[in-house]
């Protein structure tokens, strides 16, 4: 990271400064302030100063829905929003498909990349689960290679359950169905 920053003209005497919109809580976020401070410390170690604009969850969502091109976002470099990743659209396509820019979608940064668009269209039109996995792997690889996101947590929702609990099915998303659950 330091090498890339130096190549871009940044270093100890000229630090890269970024402003990030974050929230204090909401929508199942684990510990957003503590986690963002951890990220801030790690970025500082390579010479990047992160400044946070802290807002409540609903304000952050409204800010996100306006997109990076909105006048209110002019001084911001990034936004930190937690998202469920229960399906291909929620996990990938809504963030990198150029058809999903605000106000229609969640492509806050207005990413416009023909390869992402091609892969997103392919994913939408692929019914075979094995083939879909291959396309999604390509989207994920490109997202990592292009560094369009800084992924910093995958909440696997650790929990402990009594052996007396019967019928519980661990959900694939944030939505828990307690209707089949019994105790005894």
Task: Place the predicted regions along the sequence by residue.
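Structural transition elements
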Residues: 1-7, 25-34
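Short, well-ordered beta-strand elements
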Residues: 14-26, 50-51, 77
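Detector for C-terminal structural segments
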Residues: 31-41, 45, 61, 65-184
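Short, well-structured beta-strand/strand-turn elements
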Residues: 44-60
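Short regulatory "switch" loops immediately downstream of catalytic or recognition motifs
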Residues: 7, 22-24, 59-68
């Amino acid at each position: 990271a330091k090498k890339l920053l130096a190549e871009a003209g940044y270093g100890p005497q000229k630090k890269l400064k970024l402003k990030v919109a974050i929230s204090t809580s909401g929508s199942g976020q684990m510990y957003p302030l503590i986690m963002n401070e951890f990220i801030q410390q790690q970025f500082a170690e390579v010479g990047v100063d992160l400044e946070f604009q802290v807002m409540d969850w609903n304000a952050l969502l409204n800010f996100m829905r306006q997109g990076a091109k909105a006048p209110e976002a002019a001084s911001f470099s990034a936004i930190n929003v937690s998202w469920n990743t229960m399906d291909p659209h929620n996990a990938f396509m809504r963030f990198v498909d150029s058809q999903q820019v605000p106000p229609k979608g969640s492509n806050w940064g207005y990413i416009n990349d023909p390869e992402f668009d091609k892969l997103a269209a392919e994913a939408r039109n692929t019914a075979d689960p094995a083939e879909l996995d291959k396309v999604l792997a390509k989207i994920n690889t490109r997202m990592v290679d292009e560094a369009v996101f800084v992924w910093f947590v995958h909440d696997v929702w650790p929990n402990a359950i009594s052996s007396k609990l019967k019928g519980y099915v661990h959900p694939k998303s944030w939505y828990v169905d307690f209707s089949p659950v019994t105790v005894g």
